[in-house]
């Protein structure tokens, strides 16, 4: 009887030992799946594996890197991973990447980049100071990741220091994200449920209202057929790290309003909590002759003083100058 009990105990211990060993082996296998490695050969850096790119995996200021290929399975690009890699001119990002870290490609030589539509988070300054960067394809509904405890005052993904001409969105647009993107043209996805792009400017889906003007524009000609000038299209703000507001379209010098515009709205499509920052363009040309005094005052007080239309001079002589 004692012999049978002893054998039973030994069997139980053996089973537990095997179970622990198998469990441990399984855990090691899972850990192996999340391992991300890299190789650098003849200027091409290849990153592969399963899971997040390690935070310690940084190539900052590496002059040997000319091309980066991130393989499918990698789920993130780490903080400042390739910042100031002055010779980096080509980047491939797979659909598995969900997060692009803060200043990941800051100050590189890339001329174009495509961020997958499945990417959910993009870090502050990810494409900042990329002086050769002309085109970006990226999600419109991304979440901006900000650096904690920073003195950097500008919240952006692509800044004025970058040479970005066109940003094309491959998902529906979250309107406040426009505040973080400096470009000459903004192109929304064809299947965006709320907006469309006309000549690089964002309008409502039916084209009746203007919604956002790109930050680098110096002149705006509202398209004929638009019936509502939403002033937030040019008055929208960004917020710095200290909570101060600044106007995004400060480069705008001239606005041309066509005869199709029938109304002016100062608050529609407002995405920030603070009041809009007033700005002053050099010239506002108005074709419509039936604006009321309140609309004209809103234009003159928020956007500028030079409004070229003779028949309206008598309405608001202090705000209107005829040229």
Regions found by a protein language model. Name each.
Residues 1-12:
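Bacterial N-terminal signal peptides that target proteins for export
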Residues 11-21:
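Bacterial N-terminal signal peptides
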Residues 19-35:
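Sec-dependent signal peptide cleavage junction
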Residues 36-40:
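Boundary/junction segments of secreted and surface-exposed precursor proteins
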Residues 41-51, 63-76, 86-99, 108-121, ...:
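Structural signature of tandem-repeat unit edges
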Residues 56-61:
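Short amphipathic alpha-helix with an adjacent loop that forms part of the alpha/beta core around
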Residues 149-151, 159, 180-181, 268-273, ...:
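A structural signal for leucine-rich repeat
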